[in-house]
């Protein structure tokens, strides 16, 4: 048994050389906090306490191999909730929290039918349902293992979300008032410049699109959204690639959407589209 500071020093020694000081520090804080059930303050004030850390060596070996810390732990935080994640789900990002926050700012607790396309871990659908209990929310994805993870998260948090296996490029969607999606949007040519822990460990199908048709999923979703005339307006909320903001505005307008709003994330990068169709 060693003191917490000894474990911290050993972890830091190996991880700084791989990830750099800042990212190594963030990884250690998340890793130790989860495994030892300690808050960030505990990790400081209890440094000289002896602790039992049976998974330390196995965890460190995975981290040295560039496995994302969230996959080592099997969980990722989103809206302060620890969602189950695995090799079949995209790891939730802070930018997606901003998308959810933007939706909650724009829509009240009035009854809405909402669909989350490419639901992954279910973090968007579940976070929306817990914040807006009156909404009827469906989450769809193309792989059963992904749907299983989303269902596990819904059960964990007591969220009433209907998760369905659906290939959105081939199948229709249930009726909805609001369509939300963080679909694949990274051109495959960008993979070579991305971090190894993303490219090698997160599902390609959740990340990449063909170089020649980077807006593939958005076009299909807008087709589905406008396929049938509704008596009431419908809305879309998308997370997008930072380089395609203007193209997305034009695409939405070409399908008859109005009030198309492009928003930036906290890094001041074009990241979200909110648009309305019909009156």
Question: Model regions: which residues?
Answer:
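An acidic site on a long C-lobe helix of protein kinase domains
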Residues: 52, 92-95, 217
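N-terminal auxiliary segments of SAM/dcSAM-dependent transferases
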Residues: 1-73
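SAM-dependent Rossmann-like transferase core, predominantly class I methyltransferases
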Residues: 57-133, 137, 143-152, 274
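Short helix-terminating capping/connector loops at secondary-structure junctions
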Residues: 21-22, 109-110, 230-233
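S-adenosylmethionine
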Residues: 135-136, 140-279
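A general structural signal for well-ordered alpha-helical segments in protein cores
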Residues: 8, 28, 56, 66-69, ...
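Glycine-rich, flexible loop/turn motifs
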Residues: 39-40, 65-69, 74, 79-81, ...
């Amino acid at each position: 048994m060693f003191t917490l500071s000894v474990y911290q020093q050993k972890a830091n020694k190996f991880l700084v050389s791989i990830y750099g000081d800042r990212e190594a520090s963030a990884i250690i804080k998340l890793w130790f906090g989860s495994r030892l059930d300690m808050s960030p303050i505990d990790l400081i004030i209890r440094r000289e306490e002896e602790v039992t850390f049976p998974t330390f060596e196995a965890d460190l070996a995975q981290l040295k191999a560039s496995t994302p810390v969230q996959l080592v732990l099997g969980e990722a935080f989103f809206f302060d909730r620890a969602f189950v994640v695995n090799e079949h789900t995209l790891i939730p990002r802070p930018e997606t929290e901003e998308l959810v926050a933007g939706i909650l700012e724009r829509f009240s607790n009035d009854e809405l039918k909402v669909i989350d396309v490419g639901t992954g871990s279910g973090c968007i659908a579940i976070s929306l349902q817990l914040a807006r209990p009156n909404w009827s929310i469906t989450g769809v994805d193309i792989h059963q293992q992904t749907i299983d993870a989303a269902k596990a998260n819904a059960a964990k948090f007591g969220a009433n979300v209907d998760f369905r296996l659906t290939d959105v490029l081939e199948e229709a969607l249930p009726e909805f008032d609001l369509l939300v999606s963080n679909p694949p949007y990274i051109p495959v040519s960008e993979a070579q410049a991305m971090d190894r822990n993303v490219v090698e460990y997160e599902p390609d199908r959740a990340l990449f699109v063909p170089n020649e048709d980077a807006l593939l999923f958005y076009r299909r979703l807008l087709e589905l959204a406008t396929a049938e005339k509704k008596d009431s307006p419908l809305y879309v909320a998308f997370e997008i690639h930072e380089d395609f903001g203007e193209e997305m505005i034009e695409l939405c307008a070409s399908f008859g959407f109005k009030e198309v709003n492009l928003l930036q994330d906290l890094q001041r990068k074009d990241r979200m589209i909110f648009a309305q169709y019909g009156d």
